[in-house]
């Protein structure tokens, strides 16, 4: 990948009007090196083969509903596995609310969590755009 594709996370947050759910985590030096996004549905089931943890990770209705179907303990373990995999950040779309325990876990793992009011597909399209010559 050439260096021009990377973008500061803070620029993406500003451009996409993301609400920072973990403001105590400093994102000023965080760069997104892969101009793509990922919906970690398979990873939330425990499948991490071929997982590209350099991508911005998105939680939409499908992932959120799946996680809500799990027990609190299982849900925490799935988030722990995802947040421990050194992802740059996690974005909840459609105004979905991350649970307080998950926010605490994110702070512990130093993985910022954001919230977007946009539909998941719209967010994905715009998120991919910042890596395709459209500056964030």
Where are these regions (language model features)?
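Feature captures the catalytic cores and cofactor-binding loops of soluble hydro-lyases/lyases
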Residues: 49-58, 62-135
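Gly/Thr-rich phosphate-binding loop signature of adenosyl cofactor/nucleotide-binding cores
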Residues: 1-82
């Amino acid at each position: 990948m050439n260096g021009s594709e990377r973008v500061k996370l803070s620029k993406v947050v500003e451009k996409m009007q993301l609400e920072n759910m973990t403001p105590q985590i400093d994102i000023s030096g965080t760069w997104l090196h892969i101009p793509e996004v990922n919906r970690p549905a398979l990873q939330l089931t425990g499948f991490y083969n071929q997982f590209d943890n350099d991508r911005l990770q998105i939680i939409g209705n499908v992932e959120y509903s799946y996680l809500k179907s799990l027990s609190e303990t299982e849900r925490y373990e799935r988030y722990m596995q995802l947040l421990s995999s050194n992802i740059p950040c996690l974005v909840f779309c459609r105004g979905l609310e991350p649970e307080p325990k998950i926010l605490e876990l994110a702070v512990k793992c130093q993985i910022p969590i954001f919230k977007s009011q946009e539909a998941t597909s719209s967010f994905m399209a715009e998120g991919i755009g910042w890596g395709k010559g459209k500056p964030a």
